[in-house]
């Protein structure tokens, strides 16, 4: 700062560099007033305001002027905190060393070297070179972390000085936000220490071992050109100081790309960052990594060390044990090709005691062949915990448990299903058929059941003749005492009613695909002494009794169903009548009353479906509250709870209004009937 005196009696003129102006602006950003800063540097306050307006231009000029003057002395001055802060000691800003760097306001570019708090763990006490900066918290042996002993090519045997073509990709961090040079970056320590920190972390956390390959691109490229890597003994972690006393590289990471894995599997897997070599008898071909979620311990018994190394597998196993689902998981002794992964994995040949017991394979937990035999554990977890989402049935998790228990009681042999492109197994047991029949039964809508035109009724007569199974009719009608066997065309397919009482069976008719699909599992359901019959009773109880459907609704629905059947029969009898006037005169009254009953039935079934849907939603909400899936959040549960409550409250006034509507309709019907009778009497 040069002070020049102009004419007498005037304020001394100061020629300030752009850097000095930037520091004055920074003091204003830090909270000082413009007046105090202007008084401190001897500049009018209006001039200082002009500098603040042209701050960007001044910063550009400051960068242009300082890049040419970079030298070791300036670097040492910037690294020394005592001289880095401007002003006399009483005006210096107190900086708490424990606080992080202050990046507030418009702080950027070169003033970071002055405004920075001393980084924790680094020794800035003397003017040292960057390569000599030590870590205070570590022992003296860790001075091997400096740049002279740094290994940049992934070879731990030879120390190498960094050359521009071997510099780690972390060197691009020095160019953040337009920073030029190490002196003006917040990372005043060199990137060598950053790569060393990654190596140290990789030793402490084996999951980060692949990150140690950040600085081994040349070696990786050389290894990928060779079809078979050179066999070396497995490299161990070296001690920081050898017995002879001379310095060695402090901590080194195992070079997985050069090491032959201990495996009896038919291929050698060599893992680096993102490239995988698979050496087989045919020759080495490079395959792109497929990130597999499943753990890579298939092919051997899982050891405790490998279980701890894979956090996803550990979490899966803990959830499995907590819910008592070990019996649904397959044993890990299956032979399969090694898994391509982006992280190096141990494949241990000798068997150890498994940490968690596993039961033999069940058909429900068999992996499908389309999964490439590697996503076994993850696939089974999705199958057990996501069963309700897959089958749209809230009770299917209970079904899975029932299925496993009954299969264990029957001592069925292990059957591996290999062709499974679908989630459901192709070889369906009786339980799958029961679930399928319940799903198809619930999917029928009243609109399908209540077709009223003559053409549809005649079409359904033809389809009923084709589809109706006499064995099924005989079995179901055998359950209903006092009802004669009717195999005529008017007897449509019989489905269980919406009530838990098995003796009330309404008659309804469906379209052809529903009838065909739901007659297939009939022999499994109707067998009285089999496990399927017991499971059918359990399913009926779960689907209807637990739901707590109102006691008066089933009887109303049944009477409505019977009236609908009578309406269909009468309508079919009069469909062949060619005299339109006679049919209108004779059947006008009966047709009108039947249509009204049919409309009432549709309203009741609509309400019944709403109630059932709300109850299923409440069950699903209760299941979500008890499940341990990490993706389910409290906000989602609250939203679902409010949604169900809103639908529930909107349905309640409709239920109360409907009896009044029914009374009014009955009165109108009686009035119309009396009017017709009077007209007929006059004739």
UniProtKB/Swiss-Prot annotation:
GO terms for molecular function: DNA binding; DNA-binding transcription factor activity. Residues 462-478 have a biased composition (Acidic residues). Residues 220-255, 336-369, 443-525, 572-597, 652-683 are annotated as: Disordered. Homomers. Interacts with itself, danr, ey and dac to form a complex (or complexes) containing the RD factors. GO terms for cellular component: nucleus. This is Protein distal antenna. The gene is dan. Residues 338-352, 445-460 have a biased composition (Polar residues). The lineage of its organism: Eukaryota, Metazoa, Ecdysozoa, Arthropoda, Hexapoda. It is found in: Nucleus. It comes from the Eukaryota. The keyword DNA-binding applies. The keyword Nucleus applies. InterPro entries: Homeodomain-like_sf, HTH_Psq, RD_transcriptional_regulator, WH-like_DNA-bd_sf. Keywords: Developmental protein, DNA-binding, Nucleus, Phosphoprotein, Transcription, Transcription regulation. GO terms for biological process: antennal development; compound eye development; regulation of DNA-templated transcription; segment specification. Probable transcription factor with a role in the retinal determination (RD) network. Regulates ato expression and is required for normal R8 induction and differentiation. Danr appears to repress Dan expression, but Dan is required for Danr expression anterior to the morphogenetic furrow (MF). Dan and Danr lie downstream of so and require dac function for highest levels of expression. Residues 227-242, 575-591 have a biased composition (Low complexity).
């Amino acid at each position: 700062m040069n002070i020049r005196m102009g004419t007498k009696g005037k304020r001394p003129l100061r020629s300030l560099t752009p850097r000095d102006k930037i520091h004055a602006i920074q003091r204003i950003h830090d909270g000082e007033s413009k007046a105090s800063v202007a008084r401190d540097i001897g500049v009018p306050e209006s001039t200082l305001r002009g500098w603040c307006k042209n701050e960007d231009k001044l910063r550009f000029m400051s960068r242009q002027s300082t890049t040419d003057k970079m030298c070791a002395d300036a670097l040492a001055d910037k690294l020394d905190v005592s001289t880095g802060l401007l002003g006399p000691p009483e005006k210096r800003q107190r900086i708490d060393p424990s606080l992080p760097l202050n990046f507030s306001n418009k702080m950027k570019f070169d003033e970071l070297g002055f405004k920075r708090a001393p980084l924790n763990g680094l020794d800035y006490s003397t003017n040292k070179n960057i390569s000599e900066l030590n870590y205070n918290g570590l022992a003296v042996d860790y001075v091997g972390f400096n740049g002279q002993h740094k290994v940049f090519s992934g070879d731990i045997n030879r120390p190498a000085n960094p050359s521009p073509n071997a510099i780690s990709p972390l060197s691009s961090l020095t160019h953040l936000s337009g920073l030029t040079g190490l002196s003006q970056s917040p990372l005043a320590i060199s990137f060598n220490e950053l790569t060393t920190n990654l190596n140290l972390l990789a030793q402490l956390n084996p999951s980060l071992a692949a990150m140690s390959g950040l600085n081994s691109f040349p070696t990786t490229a050389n290894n990928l050109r060779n079809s078979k890597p050179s066999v070396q003994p497995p490299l161990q972690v070296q001690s920081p100081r050898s017995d002879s006393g001379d310095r060695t590289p402090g901590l080194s990471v195992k070079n997985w790309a050069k090491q032959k894995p201990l495996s009896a599997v038919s291929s050698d897997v060599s893992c680096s960052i993102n490239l995988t070599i698979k050496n087989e008898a045919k020759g080495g071909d490079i395959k792109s990594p497929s990130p597999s979620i499943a753990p890579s311990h298939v092919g051997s018994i899982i050891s405790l060390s490998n279980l701890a190394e894979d956090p996803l597998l550990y979490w899966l196993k803990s959830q499995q044990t907590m819910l008592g689902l070990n019996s649904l998981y397959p044993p890990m002794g299956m032979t399969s090709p090694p898994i391509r992964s982006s992280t190096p994995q141990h494949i241990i040949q000798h068997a150890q005691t498994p940490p968690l017991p596993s039961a033999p394979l069940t058909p429900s937990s068999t992996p499908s062949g389309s999964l490439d035999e590697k996503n076994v554990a993850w696939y089974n977890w999705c199958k057990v915990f996501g069963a309700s989402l897959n089958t749209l049935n809230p009770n299917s998790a209970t079904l899975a448990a029932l299925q496993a228990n009954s299969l264990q009681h029957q001592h069925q042999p292990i059957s591996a299903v290999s062709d499974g492109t679908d989630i459901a197994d192709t070889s369906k047991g009786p339980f799958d058929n029961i679930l399928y029949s319940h799903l198809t039964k619930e999917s029928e809508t009243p609109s399908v059941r209540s077709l009223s035109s003559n053409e549809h009724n005649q079409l359904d007569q033809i389809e009923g003749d084709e589809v109706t199974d006499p064995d099924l009719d005989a079995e179901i009608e055998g359950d209903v005492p006092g009802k004669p066997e009717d195999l005529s065309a008017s007897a449509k397919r019989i489905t269980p009613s919406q009530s838990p009482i098995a003796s009330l069976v309404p008659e309804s008719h469906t379209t052809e695909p529903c009838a065909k699909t739901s007659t297939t599992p009939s022999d499994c359901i109707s067998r009285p002494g089999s496990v399927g019959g017991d499971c059918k009773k359990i399913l009926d109880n779960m689907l209807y009794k637990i739901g707590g459907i109102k006691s008066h609704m089933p009887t109303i629905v049944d009477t409505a169903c019977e009236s609908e059947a009578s309406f269909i029969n009468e309508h079919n009898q009069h469909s062949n009548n060619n005299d339109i006037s006679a049919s209108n005169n004779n059947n006008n009254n009966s047709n009108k009353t039947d249509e009204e009953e049919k409309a009432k039935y549709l309203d009741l079934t609509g309400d019944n479906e709403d109630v059932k849907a709300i109850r299923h939603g409440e069950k699903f909400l209760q299941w979500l509250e008890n499940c341990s899936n990490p993706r389910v959040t409290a906000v989602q549960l609250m939203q679902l709870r409010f949604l169900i409550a809103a639908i529930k409250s909107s349905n309640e006034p409709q239920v109360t209004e409907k009896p009044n509507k029914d009374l009014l309709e009955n009165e109108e019907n009686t009035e119309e009937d009396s009017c017709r009778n009077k007209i007929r009497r006059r004739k």
